Design a protein with these regions (language model features):
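Nuclease and nuclease-like effector domains acting on nucleic acids or nucleotide cofactors
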Residues: 1-88, 143-149, 157-170
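Glutamate identity and glutamate-enriched acidic tracts
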Residues: 19, 51, 65-66, 95, ...
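Generic detector of ordered, mature protein regions
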Residues: 23, 44, 48-49, 105-113, ...
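A structural signal for short, well-ordered beta-strand segments and their strand-loop junctions
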Residues: 27, 93-94, 130-134, 169-172
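Amphipathic alpha-helical interaction surfaces
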Residues: 76, 100-103, 135, 139
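Histidine-centered nuclease catalytic patch
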Residues: 85-122
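Short linker/helix segments within small regulatory modules
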Residues: 112-127, 150-152, 162
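Short Cys/His-centered divalent metal-binding micro-motifs
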Residues: 123-149
Length: 172
């Protein structure tokens, strides 16, 4: 199985999505999540080299591979890291620090016939995963940042939602 070719196939899917100006961000979520898994490889892939999913995780029930992958994500909150270290019953959330809807909007702004390498550069800049607790996810929801960026977002700070919610990044 050629993992690089699989990674590139998801960039091609995103390219077609952009060219068609399809506003359905659910497809972008699937394509971007899979692109990232094949880009990172290692614990982001299961033993069959398929992308690993991170839904319904509890800190006390993580496999070694899940734990390794979570610890390699772009952002892990102090509370999430503490829960992982203590193997508490805390529910963990894999979160796109810039919501996929916003990433989709950014990608759809690419007019014409974008190259896969340019799409990958945008994903490397804006596709960022966070590990937060269920309670921290509720904080984002309470301040209406569950699926959008803050009104004053500068277009660069990928962790702006977490900053607004007072979610602190752990030091690994």
């Amino acid at each position: 199985m050629n993992l690089s070719r699989l990674k590139n196939s998801y960039l091609t899917h995103i390219k077609i999505h952009i060219e068609s100006q399809n506003p359905d961000s659910k497809l972008i979520r699937d394509f971007a999540d899979r692109w990232f898994a094949y880009y990172k490889q290692g614990p982001f892939l299961n033993k069959n080299n398929r992308e690993r999913w991170f839904n319904g995780l509890h800190a006390d029930k993580l496999s070694d591979e899940e734990r390794n992958a979570l610890l390699q994500m772009h952002f892990i909150s102090k509370d999430a890291l503490l829960a992982i270290k203590k193997q508490s019953k805390t529910k963990l959330i894999k979160d796109h620090s810039i919501p996929i809807k916003k990433i989709s909007e950014i990608l759809l702004q690419q007019k014409g016939n974008p190259l896969e390498k340019n799409i990958e550069q945008l994903l490397l800049k804006f596709y960022s995963l966070g590990v937060i607790t269920f309670e921290e996810d509720l904080k984002l929801n309470q301040i209406k940042l569950k699926s959008r960026m803050p009104e004053d977002w500068d277009g660069d700070a990928v962790f702006a939602r977490y900053d607004k919610a007072g979610i602190k990044k752990a030091k690994l």
